[in-house]
Regions:
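Short, basic, alpha-helical segments at the C-terminal edge of helix-turn-helix-like DNA-binding modules
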Residues: 69-75
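Membrane-interface starts of transmembrane alpha-helices
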Residues: 10, 154, 158-162
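Helix-turn-helix
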Residues: 2, 20, 24, 28-62, ...
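Short secondary-structure transition hinges
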Residues: 101-141
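Hydrophobic alpha-helical connector segments
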Residues: 66, 80-106, 161-165, 188-191
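C-terminal peripheral helix-coil segments that are non-catalytic and often amphipathic
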Residues: 1-5, 138-150, 163, 167-206
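Secondary-structure edge/capping motif, primarily at the C-terminal ends of alpha-helices
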Residues: 82, 111-118, 176-180
Length: 206
């Protein structure tokens, strides 16, 4: 029994150390930019040696990937919270759309000098976010399936609609971040318009 406890404690220590590196790296990337941050900078700011850092990450690119992954996990957790809310499927879809867009914007803005890297190195971001994309499609699939079962949505292919929804939102990320969607219009005012558009596409039963 004592042996199991030690293994769990060691595992927690490893996880905590790795997460500390990720947190510190994100802050350094946000402040100085990816190019101006070295592995040595990350190790020193973490209060650890370079050897310890290289135990967890082979390169700065790997650390950067971990930072993106962590940010996507934050977004995924928030979407999961919304998915668990007790509300009608059509309302939940709108809430998921705005939660996704607002969280993406908050993440990019919060990361300062790292934001340019998000757009410059889009292929690395795409590689890291693959699992997140798949999970979000599955989340939409479940909400659409519930709406179809209750008669609120007239959907022939739930899987296809879930996939289309995900990629439509993904395509709106950059213009939303830069405020190019509905200039001068508040989110409160856009929600009814977005809802009307989405409900029409889903064949919402009245």
């Amino acid at each position: 029994m004592q042996k199991t406890y030690n293994i769990n404690r060691d595992s927690m220590s490893v996880s905590k150390t790795r997460q500390n590196f990720v947190d510190v790296a994100r802050q350094l990337f946000a402040k100085n930019g990816l190019e101006n941050t070295t592995m040595n900078d990350i190790a020193q700011a973490s209060g650890k040696g370079r050897r310890t850092l290289y135990t967890y990450f082979e390169s700065k690119d790997e650390v950067y990937s971990a930072v993106i992954e962590y940010e996507l996990e934050r977004l995924s957790d928030k979407l999961d919270e919304v998915a668990e809310l007790r509300m009608r499927p059509q309302d939940k879809i709108i809430e998921l759309i705005y939660t996704h867009l607002n969280m993406i914007k908050e993440t990019v803005v919060r990361n300062g000098n790292l934001r340019a890297e998000f757009f410059r190195n889009i292929w690395m971001v795409e590689k890291v976010r693959k699992n997140f994309d798949e999970d979000e499609i599955e989340l939409f699939r479940k909400v659409y399936a519930a709406g179809k079962a209750s008669g609120e949505f007239d959907i022939d292919n739930v899987e296809l609609i879930a996939t289309i929804t995900h990629y439509c939102i993904k395509g709106l990320e950059v213009p939303f971040i830069y405020g190019r969607l509905g200039r001068g219009v508040t989110e409160l005012n856009t929600r009814p318009m977005v809802a009307k558009f989405v409900y029409g596409a889903l064949g919402k039963q009245r």
